[in-house]
């Protein structure tokens, strides 16, 4: 038997040893016949040329090692999904995919995957490859047949039923249902064209959802719920309350929390014998995009012919029901995982679907004004850039316009023409960095760096936020995006889609200020205070640390916040804790850095670095002298900290030992954080695993508590029939944001606070987690919670009658004072400067305010 191995570039790897192909004739080929450290480019590829001849037909099997050979010869991406599997492509039937054994040096957690790959390769070449069992799949294009099938499923014996949908868009308001897939048993599936979904068919679909005899299974439930509810009017409340509603994506997340591993295709490839069942669909998509010259992200499924769509769609639900039957028993064998799935993730999923569906209200008028002002400011910044002669000289020498977004041109300008000294910070490729941090440092050498920072900031605000939001607003004036439970290893929610609501600019209010409550409503934002430290105090059982929080609750005037108390203790400050924030703001920030450094496993050197960053930032803000924190200082601070909180130290050590000895750790709510690289020979990798595992138990305690509090509050609001008057629309980091009718704010606040502070076995007795309002008294007009009025008062006037009246009053008052002064002083009748100065006391945006108000 002749076997070939093809890899990326020349190397000394003994593939016969790695693949255990002893005694077989193995030839090794390299796509590039030279050693290569970077990316493989087209110009590097020599395989198949006279200098590097290769013909797969000379071999019984060809093992493609790594992503590059797999894509080049088998036409596919996703080597991790295909590793150990045989692939037919381009007339050759015996390509075998494999991840590279070189990965094991820096990703030892891949060893089980590679071992399974080797075992599968031996099965294939020795004729022991498992033959996939044939399935019963069919399309339904007749309404009567659709009704008959759905009725049959409803009347069948108890069992799981898997559903899926194919759609013309990613958001239910942007598109429509193309069809619905259903599988009522393994190795079976139908795809029903949406034209066949009559009232009778939809009626029986609802009957299936409500039937106690049926377990309802989806993969990525939240996505399909949007379309089923919006386009078919189906409801899932009964199935959810009876714990019959399931999501195989979340099931897999419970069993393997790593990112990027939860897609249906990947899971079907890994856990079933279905193989690459959507190959024809992917090929059509690729061919269509090439033929019509469109980007893959612009491709929509309504472009796929029905004959190509239905086999793929019908198999999706077969894959889903098989995965459910495989995953759920594993979860239900483990009490902690079972609790996490049923009590946290599934309620969270249903709740987040409601949150997404409500949308976030946007003031289009504010957004357009923001676009106008930002564009104006960007043009001014670009004009300022050209006042520096070095820019004009560079353009003249290179005979092309300078592009501030070109990193290459930026380096040439800053280091060759302006002559700045690089900061020492390098990119991954070893070049001098020009990121925001580097430009901030370079700004101390020359003002051009500050101008470039301003251009970069304004460009991002316009392109990433303003323009994107304007294109994404639904007809009701809201933007709808995604919140996800399965995208982080720690359990923190993430946001993506039309807008990442967790990455809105914090210090710049112009974007948040465009999230505006409708008339008669207010934006209410509540935020957990020092949440991760609080839960560390609870989980550790450190009475001294818990007492700090008890003091803060019982005597808030004397003990205002945790970090002030810690600064008072660590730095032995000669003042009351309540005065620390005012008298020693830099040391308070330093204390904060020490606390989080200790919790997240930083040593003295890293703590010293974090403290110095905090001190420098405060020095820049306040003008206080900067006094460096040395490593010796940091070591002393850590010792003082643990001397005060000894049980915290013992708990941290215990958690670290659990991770080192067992390679996993459970959170309070049952999350299992698996640290696959804990036994790595690289101490840096091992240390990162310990930090990651410990971080997860603290962060998940905070995020899960907040999520469950919001879920319970939302359920209570719905039970009171107030869902339209009190809408939770965002969960961002440690805060819950809602749109609430003005006369119900007090009631909403009571409901939310009570549910978030509910004792879930993770509270200090008599001292629940603190929760503070980010909003102004009585609620805020917009999500900036008052910052918009200070930073952009002209925009704040839009869609805010109350603030507009106030601003107009200031203008009238200034005008009256001007006329009075002019009447008294005939020699100097023009007192417009006084008028402007008086108004600037209210805002710095006089010209735009006058333009908008017509003043």
Swiss-Prot record:
SUPFAM superfamilies: DNA/RNA polymerases, Ribonuclease H-like
Domain of life: Viruses
E.C. number: 2.7.7.7, 3.1.11.-
GO molecular function: 3'-5' exonuclease activity; DNA binding; DNA-directed DNA polymerase activity
UniProt similarity note: Belongs to the DNA polymerase type-A family.
SMART domains xrefs: 35EXOc, POLAc
Official protein name in the record: DNA polymerase
Domain notes: The C-terminus seems to increase the affinity of the DNA for the polymerase active site, and thus increase processivity and decrease the accessibility of the DNA to the exonuclease active site.
InterPro entries registered for this protein in UniProt: 3'-5'_exonuclease_dom, DNA-dir_DNA_pol_A_CS, DNA-dir_DNA_pol_A_palm_dom, DNA/RNA_pol_sf, DNA_polymerase_A, RNaseH-like_sf, RNaseH_sf
Its biological purpose: Replicates the viral genomic DNA. This polymerase possesses two enzymatic activities: DNA synthesis (polymerase) and an exonucleolytic activity that degrades single-stranded DNA in the 3'-5' direction for proofreading purpose. The DNA synthesis very likely occurs by strand displacement.
Annotated segments matching region Polymerase: 333-833
Pfam families, alphabetized: DNA_pol_A (PF00476), DNA_pol_A_exo1 (PF01612)
Keyword NAD tagged: no
GO biological process: DNA-templated DNA replication; double-strand break repair; viral DNA genome replication
Subunit structure: Single-chain monomer with multiple functions.
Catalytic function, reaction form: DNA(n) + a 2'-deoxyribonucleoside 5'-triphosphate = DNA(n+1) + diphosphate
Induction of the gene: Expressed in the early phase of the viral replicative cycle.
3'-5' exonuclease domain boundaries: 107-332
Keywords tagged on the record: DNA replication, DNA-binding, DNA-directed DNA polymerase, Early protein, Exonuclease, Hydrolase, Nuclease, Nucleotidyltransferase, Transferase, Viral DNA replication
Record's keyword annotation contains Nuclease: yes
């Amino acid at each position: 038997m002749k076997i070939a191995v093809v890899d990326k570039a020349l190397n000394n790897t003994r593939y016969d040893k790695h693949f255990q192909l002893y005694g077989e004739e193995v030839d090794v080929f390299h796509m590039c016949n030279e050693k290569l450290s970077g990316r493989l480019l087209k110009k590097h590829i020599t395989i198949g040329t006279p200098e590097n001849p290769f013909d797969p037909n000379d071999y019984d099997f060809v093992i493609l090692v790594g992503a590059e050979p797999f894509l080049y010869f088998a036409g596919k991406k996703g080597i991790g999904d295909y590793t150990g599997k045989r692939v037919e492509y381009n007339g050759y039937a015996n390509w075998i995919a494999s991840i590279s054994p070189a990965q094991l040096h820096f990703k030892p957690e891949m060893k089980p995957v590679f071992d399974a790959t080797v075992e599968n390769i031996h099965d294939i070449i020795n004729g022991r490859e498992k033959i996939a069992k044939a399935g019963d799949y069919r399309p339904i294009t007749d309404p009567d047949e659709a009704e008959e099938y759905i009725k049959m499923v409803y009347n069948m014996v108890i069992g799981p039923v898997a559903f899926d949908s194919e759609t013309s868009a990613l958001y239910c308001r942007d598109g429509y249902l193309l069809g619905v897939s259903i599988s009522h048993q393994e190795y079976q599936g139908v795809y029903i064209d949406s034209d066949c979904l009559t009232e009778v068919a939809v009626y029986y679909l609802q009957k299936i959802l409500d039937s106690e005899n049926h377990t309802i299974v989806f993969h990525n439930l939240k996505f399909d719920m949007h379309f089923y509810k919006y386009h078919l009017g189906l409801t899932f409340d009964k199935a959810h309350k009876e714990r019959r509603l399931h999501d195989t994506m979340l099931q897999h997340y419970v069993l393997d929390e790593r990112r990027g591993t939860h897609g249906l295709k990947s899971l079907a490839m890994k856990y079933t014998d279905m193989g690459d069942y959507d190959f024809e669909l992917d090929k059509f998509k690729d061919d269509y995009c090439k033929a019509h010259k469109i980007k893959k992200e612009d491709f929509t499924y309504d472009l796929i012919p029905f004959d190509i769509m239905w086999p793929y769609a019908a198999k999706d639900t077969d894959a889903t029901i098989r995965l459910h039957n495989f995953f759920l028993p594993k979860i239900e064998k483990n009490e902690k995982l079972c609790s996490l799935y049923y009590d946290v993730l599934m309620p969270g999923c249903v709740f987040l679907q409601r949150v997404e569906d409500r949308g976030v209200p946007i003031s289009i008028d504010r957004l357009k004004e923001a676009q106008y002002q930002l564009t104006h400011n960007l043009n001014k910044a670009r004009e300022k850039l050209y006042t520096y002669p070095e820019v004009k000289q560079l353009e003249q020498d290179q005979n092309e316009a300078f592009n501030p977004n070109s990193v290459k041109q930026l380096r040439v300008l800053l280091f060759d023409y302006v002559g700045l000294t690089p900061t020492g910070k390098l990119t991954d490729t070893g070049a001098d960095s020009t990121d925001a941090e580097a430009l901030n440092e370079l700004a101390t050498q020359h003002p051009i760096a500050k101008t470039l920072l301003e251009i970069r900031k304004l460009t991002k605000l316009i392109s990433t936020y303003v323009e994107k939001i304007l294109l994404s607003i639904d007809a009701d004036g809201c933007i709808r995006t995604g919140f996800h439970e399965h995208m982080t290893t720690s359990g923190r929610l993430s946001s993506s889609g039309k807008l990442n609501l967790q990455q809105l600019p914090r210090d710049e209010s112009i974007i948040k200020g465009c999230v505006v409550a409708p008339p008669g409503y207010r934006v209410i934002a509540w935020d957990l205070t020092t949440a991760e430290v609080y839960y560390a105090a609870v989980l550790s059982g450190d009475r001294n640390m818990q007492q700090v929080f008890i003091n803060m609750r019982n005597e808030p005037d004397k003990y205002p916040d945790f970090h002030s108390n810690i600064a008072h203790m660590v730095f032995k400050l000669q003042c009351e804790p309540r005065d620390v924030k005012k008298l020693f703001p830099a040391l308070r920030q330093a204390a904060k850095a020490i606390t989080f450094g200790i919790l997240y496993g930083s040593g003295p050197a890293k703590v010293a670095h974090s403290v110095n960053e905090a001190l420098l930032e405060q020095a820049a803000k306040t003008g206080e002298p900067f006094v460096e924190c040395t490593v010796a200082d940091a070591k002393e601070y850590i010792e003082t900290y643990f001397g005060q909180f000894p049980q915290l130290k013992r708990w941290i050590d215990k958690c670290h030992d659990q991770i080192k000895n067992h390679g996993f750790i459970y959170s309070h709510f049952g999350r299992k954080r698996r640290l696959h690289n804990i036994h790595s020979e690289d101490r840096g990798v091992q240390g990162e695993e310990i930090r990651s595992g410990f971080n997860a138990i603290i962060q998940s305690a905070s995020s899960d508590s907040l999520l469950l509090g919001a879920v319970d509050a939302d359920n209570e609001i719905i039970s009171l029939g107030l869902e339209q008057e009190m809408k939770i629309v965002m969960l961002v980091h440690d805060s819950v944001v809602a749109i609430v009718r003005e006369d119900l704010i007090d009631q909403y606040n009571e409901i939310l606070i009570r549910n978030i502070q509910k004792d879930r076995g993770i509270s200090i007795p008599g001292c629940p987690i603190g929760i503070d309002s980010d909003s102004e008294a009585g609620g805020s007009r917009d999500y900036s919670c008052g910052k918009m009025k200070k930073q952009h008062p002209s925009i704040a006037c839009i869609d805010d009658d109350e603030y507009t009246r106030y601003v107009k009053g200031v203008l009238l008052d200034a005008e009256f004072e001007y006329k009075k002064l002019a009447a008294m002083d005939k020699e100097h009748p023009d007192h417009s400067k006084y008028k402007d100065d008086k108004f600037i006391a209210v805002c710095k945006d006089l010209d735009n305010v006058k333009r908008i108000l017509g003043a």
